[in-house]
């Protein structure tokens, strides 16, 4: 049987992987491995086991052994529509332990603890590679133990199974009914624990803990997962685009706004919000600790693109610690430079030197939110210059609007909202009013409250009223330690939080209340597509 490389388990490239990479590597070992699957009832152990069998079925014969109910019922409850396995892969010991999909000559009539190992050996002899799961192992042990006057304890039988698995190169999965550590963990080669809990607002949070995987380096022990659509799926780390010069080859297909709503630019989020953000509303995007410095862009960039693609004005005050050139490079990749120059207004302020430990970002690398792509150091960032001879070199007049995002050129009649390197409220409002006069459409304001704290600390209420009056949309960005965080929440119509869960990124709404949503970013196309998967 030809098989794919299990080190790279199947994924749909949207931040969801069907089986953890570490577990695929664990089962690739030369010797048979025994995995203990811990978890309280209702944590998703059976769906996890079925997912594992589904993946391992690609290069082995698999068998799911249970004492639950009959084959048809088990298949209908857990396998149908969620697995490629049919009823022949399911064995109910309560019925006939010898009704196997393989041609096996079993030299005994009754299955008990003494004959269990021989039974497994006979099945293995009829296959090239066997994977067998016992769900649950305690119930199967108890069912077979009652056939003995003085049965060996479960620890002894488990040890015999693990030894047999190593000798015969059999993959074993033993499902238990407890999350508490047990003596069995010292016998087996690998241990995972499935956990589920609810937060104070009733949202379900599920995590897979990789306790032990012999021979495998575990970089991230805690991995969030979901049982959405009745399937076990791991929510994986997502990658941000490497900061680079835009090519202009992408095409952003805008999502339509309605009379009452602005599209978020993310189809899944529009669906959750019944069409998007309300017109005239203030949205608070609350960033949790330990996120990368460009995490703010995950939700804001799609909305910015959607406004600009419909030739609607956008004013952005980005975080001071964001990657230089992020907006310019991203937007010029998916929109024409004329659209960016005409409708996008970026106001960056002077941050000055800082050695603060309370930053968005972690040390740079190239992998994910937790390991960001290397960006241009501040000293090497492009400086603002005036356009000369109409040259289209990406440098435009900033007239006090400083920074490397090469903002919209300031009209001679427009007064810069930057005073002494800092954003000022009245000049900002005067500036957007002049922008508004050039268009009949509402504006999008994207404002980092850390950057704009001095300008907005006494005017947030006034600004929220202004936004409502003009049917604009505002995204206020705060992070841990932002002084205006609580005040931003008070004036906001919606409140969303972005936080880390293991190495993955989770989004959820406080107002409106939403489930936890795993974020996936597909980079298989020229424009990244963001997907949201509900954690259930």
Swiss-Prot record:
This is Protein GvpD1. Pfam families: GvpD_bR2, GvpD_P-loop. Causes a decrease in the amount of GvpE protein. The 5'-region of its promoter or mRNA has a repressive function on downstream genes. Gas vesicles are hollow, gas filled proteinaceous nanostructures found in several microbial planktonic microorganisms. They allow positioning of halobacteria at the optimal depth for growth in the poorly aerated, shallow brine pools of their habitat. Expression of a 9.5 kb p-vac DNA fragment containing 2 divergently transcribed regions (gvpD-gvpE-gvpF-gvpG-gvpH-gvpI-gvpJ-gvpK-gvpL-gvpM and gvpA-gvpC-gvpN-gvpO) allows H.volcanii to produce gas vesicles. A similar region restores gas vesicle production in H.halobium without the p-vac locus, but it still has the c-vac locus. Residues 373-385 have a biased composition (Low complexity). The keyword Lyase does not apply. Keywords: ATP-binding, Cytoplasm, Nucleotide-binding, Plasmid. Interacts with GvpE. GO terms for cellular component: cytoplasm. Disruption phenotype: Partially gas vesicle-deficient. A double gvpD1-gvpE1 deletion is partially gas vesicle-deficient, still transcribes gvpA1. Induction: Transcribed divergently from the gvpA gene. Maximally transcribed in late log phase, probably part of a gvpD1-gvpE1 operon. Gas vesicles appear earlier when grown in static culture, possibly due to O(2)-limitation. It is found in: Cytoplasm. One of its GO terms (molecular function) is ATP binding. Residues 386-396 have a biased composition (Basic and acidic residues). Residues 363-372 have a biased composition (Polar residues). The lineage of its organism: Archaea, Methanobacteriati, Methanobacteriota, Stenosarchaea group, Halobacteria. Residues 352-413 are annotated as: Disordered. Belongs to the gas vesicle GvpD family. The gene is gvpD11. The keyword Metal-binding does not apply. ATP binds at residues 39-46. Encoded in a 14-gene plasmid locus called p-vac which produces predominantly short, spindle-shaped gas vesicles during all stages of growth.
């Amino acid at each position: 049987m030809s098989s794919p490389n299990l080190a790279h388990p199947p994924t749909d490239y949207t931040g969801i992987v069907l089986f953890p990479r570490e577990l695929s590597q664990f089962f690739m070992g030369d010797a048979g491995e025994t995995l203990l699957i811990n978890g309280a009832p209702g944590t998703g152990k059976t769906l996890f086991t079925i997912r594992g069998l589904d993946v391992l079925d690609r290069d082995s014969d698999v068998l799911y052994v249970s004492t639950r109910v009959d084959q048809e019922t088990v298949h209908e409850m857990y396998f149908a529509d969620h697995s490629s396995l049919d009823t022949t892969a399911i064995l109910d010991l309560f019925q006939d332990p010898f009704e196997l999909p393989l041609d096996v000559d079993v030299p005994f009539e009754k299955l008990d603890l003494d004959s269990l190992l021989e039974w497994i050996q006979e099945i293995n002899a009829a296959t090239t590679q066997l994977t067998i799961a016992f769900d649950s192992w305690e119930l199967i042990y108890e069912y077979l133990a009652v056939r003995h006057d003085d049965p060996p304890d479960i620890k002894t039988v488990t040890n015999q199974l693990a030894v047999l698995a190593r000798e015969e190169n059999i993959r074993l999965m033993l499902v238990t009914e407890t999350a508490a550590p047990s003596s069995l963990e010292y016998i087996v080669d690998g241990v995972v624990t499935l956990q589920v809990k609810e937060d104070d607002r009733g949202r379900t949070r599920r995590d897979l803990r990789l306790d032990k995987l012999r021979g495998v380096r575990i970089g991230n022990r805690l991995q969030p997962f979901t049982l959405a659509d009745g399937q076990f799926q791991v929510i994986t780390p997502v990658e941000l685009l490497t900061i680079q010069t835009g090519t202009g080859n992408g095409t952003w297909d805008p999502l339509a706004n309605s009379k009452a709503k602005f599209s978020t630019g993310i189809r899944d989020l529009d669906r959750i919000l019944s069409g998007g953000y309300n017109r005239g509303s203030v949205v608070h995007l609350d960033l949790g600790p330990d996120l990368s410095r460009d995490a703010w862009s995950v939700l804001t960039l799609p909305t910015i693109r959607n406004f600009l693609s419909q030739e609607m004005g956008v004013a952005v005050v980005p975080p001071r610690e964001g990657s230089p050139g992020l907006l310019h490079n991203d937007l010029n990749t998916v929109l024409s430079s004329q659209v960016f120059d005409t409708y996008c207004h970026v106001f960056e302020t002077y941050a000055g030197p800082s050695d603060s430990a309370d930053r968005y970002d972690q040390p740079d690398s190239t992998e994910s939110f937790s390991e960001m792509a290397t960006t241009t150091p501040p000293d090497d960032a492009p400086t603002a210059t005036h356009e000369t001879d109409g040259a289209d070199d990406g440098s435009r007049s900033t007239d006090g609007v400083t920074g490397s995002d090469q903002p919209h050129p300031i009209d001679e009649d427009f007064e810069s909202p930057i005073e002494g390197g800092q954003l000022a409220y009245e000049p900002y409002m005067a500036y957007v009013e002049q922008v508004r006069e050039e268009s009949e459409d509402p504006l999008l304001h994207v404002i980092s409250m850390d950057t704009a704290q001095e300008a907005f600390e006494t005017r947030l209420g006034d600004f929220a009223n202004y936004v409502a009056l003009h049917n604009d949309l505002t995204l206020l960005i705060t992070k841990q330690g932002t002084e205006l965080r609580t005040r931003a929440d008070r004036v906001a119509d919606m409140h969303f939080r972005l936080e880390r869960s293991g190495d993955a990124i989770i989004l959820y709404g406080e107002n409106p209340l939403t489930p936890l949503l795993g974020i996936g970013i597909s980079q298989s196309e020229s424009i990244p597509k963001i997907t949201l998967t509900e954690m259930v």
